[in-house]
């Protein structure tokens, strides 16, 4: 009897996940003026910006969602074609990644470290910006702009973090590297790499994993005339620690090659109007 209850509960959860309406999966952000940036920041100075209303996903795009895209289109990612994905393993020096020809979204850290079979609710990684563009085209959505992402992340705050001025509470809201550096493996929060989306507490607007878990691609340029091969990502990832890659905040902006695939890189979608369910 207990087993039957568990199975019934699982079916209900799966149905709710699949049938969730766009209104449940997205947060509406009203048009208006917003304060973004940080005083003295070279690439993102404090300023007031206007944005039109938009919608942004509550969660980062998952392996399950990306798998549906691949199943429908037979799409082959950059990492699968080029065999040049970059993955991380504990014990390497700071900012040192290794190329793994076996790594792609189904095996985000390489075949030797296992696949995503039991991680369908984790964010998809080891994909390029180009791959994400193709997904968005299929799904009828888009990436948030740099400004939209920050407005959604801040959730009305003007401090460095949506929960205050200091990062003391980061472990409540984000899957980040809690060790002092990367020479020692750290999974004290239960996750060495990615965690299920929505596992940590949301920001005040109900958006999950705005900090940590995976870097999130954004559209737009930091400066005029920027090379088209360079794109941007925000929010930090599971790899970011207090000592290095301290990007789990509301103001920093990362930069990466458009065709590069990293095991800590993912995305969250947005839309100008409420999208149809795919």
Features from the language model and the residues they span:
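Functional-site microenvironments in short loops/helix caps that host divalent-cation chemistry
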Residues: 27-29, 33-35, 76, 82-254, ...
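Short Gly/aromatic-enriched secondary-structure transition segments
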Residues: 44-46, 68-72, 82-83
């Amino acid at each position: 009897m207990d087993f039957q209850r568990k199975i019934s509960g699982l079916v209900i959860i799966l149905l709710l996940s699949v049938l969730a309406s766009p209104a449940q999966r997205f947060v509406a952000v009203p048009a208006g003026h917003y304060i973004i940036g940080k005083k003295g920041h070279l690439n993102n100075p404090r300023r007031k910006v206007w944005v039109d209303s938009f919608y942004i996903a509550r969660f980062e795009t998952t392996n399950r969602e990306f798998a549906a895209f691949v199943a429908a289109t037979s799409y082959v990612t950059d990492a699968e074609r080029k065999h040049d994905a970059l993955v991380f393993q504990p014990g390497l020096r700071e900012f040192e990644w290794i190329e793994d020809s076996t790594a792609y979204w189904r095996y985000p850290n390489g075949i030797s470290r296992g696949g995503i079979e039991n991680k369908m609710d984790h964010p998809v990684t080891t994909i390029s910006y180009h791959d994400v563009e193709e997904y968005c085209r299929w799904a009828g959505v888009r990436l948030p702009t740099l400004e939209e992402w920050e407005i959604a992340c801040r959730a009305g705050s003007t401090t460095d973090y949506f929960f205050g001025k200091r990062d003391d509470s980061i472990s409540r809201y984000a899957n980040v590297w809690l060790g002092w550096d990367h020479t020692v493996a750290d999974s004290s929060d239960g996750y060495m790499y990615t965690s299920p989306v929505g596992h940590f507490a949301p920001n005040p607007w109900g958006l999950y994993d705005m900090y940590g878990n995976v870097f999130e691609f954004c559209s737009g340029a930091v400066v005029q005339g920027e090379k088209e091969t360079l794109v941007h990502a925000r929010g930090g990832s599971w790899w970011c620690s207090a000592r290095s890659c301290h990007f789990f905040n509301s103001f920093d902006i990362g930069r990466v090659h458009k065709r590069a695939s990293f095991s800590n890189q993912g995305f969250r979608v947005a839309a100008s109007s409420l999208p149809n369910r795919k």
